Regions:
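Membrane-interface helix-boundary motifs at transmembrane edges
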Residues: 1-6, 35, 61-75
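Alpha-helical transmembrane segments
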Residues: 4-15, 46-50, 73-80
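Membrane-embedded alpha-helical segments of integral membrane proteins
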Residues: 11-63
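Internal/C-terminal transmembrane anchor helices
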Residues: 68-97
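Alpha-helical transmembrane signal-anchor/signal-peptide segments
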Residues: 92-117
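Extracytosolic and intramembrane catalytic regions of membrane-associated proteins
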Residues: 108-170
């Protein structure tokens, strides 16, 4: 039972570390966003903390009573030092990049909605970079909410169509 528990913990720790890497290195290639903008602004910091705790947890789980005392002390201290890596990466580099995790949405306006599916809309999103507020970015996106917490957003160009299910929001 203990072995199953430790293997499950190791699996979750590795999953959080992979999630951190994919989110910050490849996250702009995915079109899934949080619908709650307040939570979305806190999520990178939560993910950084979970990754650091996961790295430290993997080192702690590597401590064995059969090892010599100095080896366990090295694992304990080394785990703490390696757990600082996500904090240093985020606060030293990622925090100052103007990527999707640093975009602050100033205004979001729905211009069309689908009369067949209420979860599909076309929005104009005005966002500004969280690090320097000088550059304002306007995007027209197709948004499809697939759970109460997530939505998919893809860039779209608006074209006039005769027979469409889209209705203009007034």
């Amino acid at each position: 039972m203990f072995r199953l528990f430790t293997n499950t913990l190791k699996f979750f720790c590795i999953a959080f570390i992979i999630w951190f890497a994919v989110y910050f290195l490849l996250g702009d290639r995915f079109s899934i966003y949080f619908t709650d903008r307040v939570f979305a602004s806190y999520f990178p910091e939560i993910l950084v903390f979970l990754t650091a705790a996961s790295i430290y947890g993997l080192f702690i789980l590597a401590i064995k009573s059969s090892y010599k005392k100095w080896q366990n002390i090295l694992l304990f201290i080394g785990g703490f030092l390696f757990a600082l890596t996500p904090f240093l990466a985020y606060h030293g580099y990622f925090q100052y990049q103007c990527d999707f995790w640093n975009q602050e949405i100033k205004e979001e306006k729905t211009i069309y909605f689908n009369s067949q599916n209420k979860f599909e809309t076309v929005k104009v999103i005005q966002s500004v970079c969280g690090t320097d507020n000088s550059e304002i970015k306007l995007d027209t996106v197709f948004s499809k909410q697939f759970t109460p917490y997530f939505e998919m957003q893809n860039p779209v160009k608006i074209q006039k169509v005769e027979n469409a299910d889209w209705t203009v929001v007034k």
